[in-house]
């Protein structure tokens, strides 16, 4: 059976006007307590799009207070039927579909995303994920347990409470939905901090949340910086859980703050240096295409990027040649322009970090096959770059680059490549390309990664749990397991006069 047809991609919205730039608390728009604002840039032009209210600890305190009030026993949210929560989430998904063109245009302008990708993948994936979570709202069940003695025992899955949610800049809207969807489905309230680089789609979503009919205080959105607003959420004594997607370095700080405060629950989806293993029997054209997509999609700004390509010795040269040909086909430019394959990196800091790592690859002896520098005179663009003859000890083989840079390494045996693939502090994703079923199962079982793709790469769906091993994070998002991350499991044991089977 063929996949459902994708919707036609319209032209981006012309003359975009940003309507929402304030802090959203209790279904109302607020200025920051400090009176500060911060600029939001278009990374393709380096121009300021608008200025947004800069939330900090005082604003987070207000948002948490509103979220706590909305979570009180007897509140409209706590007494709402679970099926009604699902209806509200479906209504929100419908409003996203209505505003799909607007949201995709904002993602492209604010986040540097190729517009077609934003419209099809980011919006399509966000809407599907929200509808998936909506369907779970009245299907989160406890159990009855046949315990010993004259005792009737059952379990309840209850919402945790006030959840702080810190969103990354690489997939601002998709990660916003991955966070709020499960949390709201289970009956929690949330305080969301979008990334300071990309707050605009989250703030538009705030207007849709109010329009959909969510009670005041259920969703609160505080734009601001990590060291101020993010730290305030992580260390807040009245936040019951924090979820974060971003770098491992910041994830460590969040987990430390959670432990030092009230030992709040923590879900972390962090960095990666994901291996992609291509055996000689693989369909090489398919492997080249998926490996290319796996590292160059969204300018390489993906936590699951296939940033270590291991290719069996006998097909190595052909794989490199085909990969270079594929990378050279890329067209760079303004992501709103039709026919563009690659937009800019998110900001100057990321842009300069990528160029520094590329220089390290040159100095350490990797062979630069194509790219290797800045592109254009304006915007944070990096040329699609391919390195061959990469060895495991090079910086480009060990550090997360988060840019359009492909490292291709050679291997001789299955035992060798498994050992090398696992020789990293990360464990988020991996890919295996082979026609041998036994080999595919053996290697996928041996790889230390939260998701392993076989003969494909970067295939994500709302039905499947996603998360990392080792320093790539804790917990899971999406799927049934992702829902349960937003519940506490309570056992209730009742003394009765007589128990009967």
UniProtKB/Swiss-Prot annotation:
Modification N6-acetyllysine, positions: 91, 128, 252, 353, 367, 410, 419, 435, 495
GO MF, one example: retinal dehydrogenase activity
Similarity comment: Belongs to the aldehyde dehydrogenase family.
Xref: InterPro entries: Ald_DH/histidinol_DH, Ald_DH_C, Ald_DH_CS_CYS, Ald_DH_CS_GLU, Ald_DH_N, Aldehyde_DH_dom
Tissue: Strongly expressed in kidney, lung, testis, intestine, stomach, and trachea, but weakly in the liver.
Regulation: Inhibited by chloral hydrate.
CDD domains per record: ALDH_F1AB_F2_RALDH1
Compartments, record wording: Cytoplasm, Cytosol; Cell projection, Axon
Active site: 269, 303
Reported function: Cytosolic dehydrogenase that catalyzes the irreversible oxidation of a wide range of aldehydes to their corresponding carboxylic acid. Functions downstream of retinol dehydrogenases and catalyzes the oxidation of retinaldehyde into retinoic acid, the second step in the oxidation of retinol/vitamin A into retinoic acid. This pathway is crucial to control the levels of retinol and retinoic acid, two important molecules which excess can be teratogenic and cytotoxic.
Modification after translation: The N-terminus is blocked most probably by acetylation.
Modification Phosphothreonine, positions: 337
Entry's EC annotation: 1.2.1.19, 1.2.1.28, 1.2.1.3, 1.2.1.36
Superkingdom in the source lineage: Eukaryota
Site (Transition state stabilizer): 170
Reactions it catalyzes: an aldehyde + NAD(+) + H2O = a carboxylate + NADH + 2 H(+); all-trans-retinal + NAD(+) + H2O = all-trans-retinoate + NADH + 2 H(+); 9-cis-retinal + NAD(+) + H2O = 9-cis-retinoate + NADH + 2 H(+); 11-cis-retinal + NAD(+) + H2O = 11-cis-retinoate + NADH + 2 H(+)
Name by which UniProt lists this protein: Aldehyde dehydrogenase 1A1
Sequence segments annotated as region (Mediates interaction with PRMT3): 336-501
Assembly and interaction partners: Homotetramer. Interacts with PRMT3; the interaction is direct, inhibits ALDH1A1 aldehyde dehydrogenase activity and is independent of the methyltransferase activity of PRMT3.
Gene Ontology biological process terms in this record: 9-cis-retinoic acid biosynthetic process; 9-cis-retinoic acid metabolic process; apoptotic process; cellular detoxification of aldehyde; embryonic eye morphogenesis; estrous cycle; fructosamine catabolic process; fructose catabolic process
Keywords for this protein: Acetylation, Cell projection, Cytoplasm, Lipid metabolism, NAD, Oxidoreductase, Phosphoprotein
Residues where Phosphoserine is found: 413
GO cellular component, one term: synapse
Metabolic or biological pathway: Cofactor metabolism; retinol metabolism
Gene name as annotated: Aldh1a1
Keyword Heme: no
Organism: Rattus norvegicus
């Amino acid at each position: 059976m063929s996949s459902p047809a994708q919707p036609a991609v319209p032209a981006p919205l012309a003359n975009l006007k940003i309507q929402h730039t304030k802090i959203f608390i209790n279904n109302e728009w607020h200025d920051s307590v400090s009176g500060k604002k911060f600029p939001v840039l278009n990374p393709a032009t380096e121009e300021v799009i608008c200025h947004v209210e800069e939330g900090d600890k005082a604003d987070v305190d207000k948002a948490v207070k509103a979220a706590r009030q909305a979570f009180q026993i007897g509140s409209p949210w706590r007494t709402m039927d679970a099926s009604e929560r699902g209806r509200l989430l479906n209504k929100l998904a419908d409003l996203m579909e209505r505003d799909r063109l607007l949201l995709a245009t904002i993602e492209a302008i604010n986040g540097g995303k190729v517009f077609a990708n934003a419209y099809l993948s980011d919006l399509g994936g966000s809407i599907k994920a929200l509808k998936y979570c909506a369907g779970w709202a009245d299907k989160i069940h406890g159990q009855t347990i046949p315990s010993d003695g004259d005792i009737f025992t059952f379990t309840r899955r209850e919402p945790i409470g006030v959840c702080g949610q810190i969103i990354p800049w690489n997939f601002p809207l998709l990660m916003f939905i991955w966070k709020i969807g499960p949390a709201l489905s289970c009956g929690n309230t949330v305080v969301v901090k979008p990334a300071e680089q990309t707050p605009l789609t989250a703030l538009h979503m705030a207007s849709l949340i109010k329009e959909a009919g969510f009670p005041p205080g259920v969703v609160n959105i505080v734009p601001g910086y990590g060291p101020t607003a993010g730290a305030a959420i992580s260390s807040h004594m009245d936040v019951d859980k924090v979820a974060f997607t971003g770098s491992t370095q910041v994830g460590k700080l969040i987990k430390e703050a959670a432990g030092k405060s009230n030992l709040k629950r923590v879900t972390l989806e962090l960095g990666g240096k994901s291996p992609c293993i291509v055996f000689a029997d693989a369909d090489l054209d398919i492997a080249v295409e998926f490996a290319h997509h796996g590292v160059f999609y969204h300018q390489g700004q993906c936590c699951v990027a296939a940033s270590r390509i291991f290719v069996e010795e006998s097909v190595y040269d052909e794989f490199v040649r085909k990969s270079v040909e594929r990378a050279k086909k890329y067209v760079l430019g303004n992501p709103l322009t039709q026919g563009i394959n690659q937009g800019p990196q998110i900001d100057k800091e990321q842009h300069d970090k990528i160029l520094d790592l590329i220089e390290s690859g040159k100095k350490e002896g990797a062979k630069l096959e194509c790219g290797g520098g800045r592109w254009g005179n304006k915007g944070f663009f990096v040329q699609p770059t391919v390195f061959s003859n990469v060895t495991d000890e090079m910086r480009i083989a060990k550090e997360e680059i988060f840019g359009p840079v492909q490292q291709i390494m050679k291997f001789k045996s299955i035992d060798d490549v498994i050992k090398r693939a696992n020789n990293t502090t990360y464990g988020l994703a991996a890919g295996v390309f082979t026609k041998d079923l036994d080999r595919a199962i053996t290697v996928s079982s041996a790889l230390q990664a939260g998701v392993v793709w076989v003969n494909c790469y970067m295939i994500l769906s709302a039905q499947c749990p996603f998360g990392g091993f080792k320093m790539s994070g804790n917990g899971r998002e999406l799927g049934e397991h992702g829902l349960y991350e937003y519940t506490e499991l309570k056992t209730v044991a009742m003394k009765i006069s007589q128990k009967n089977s």
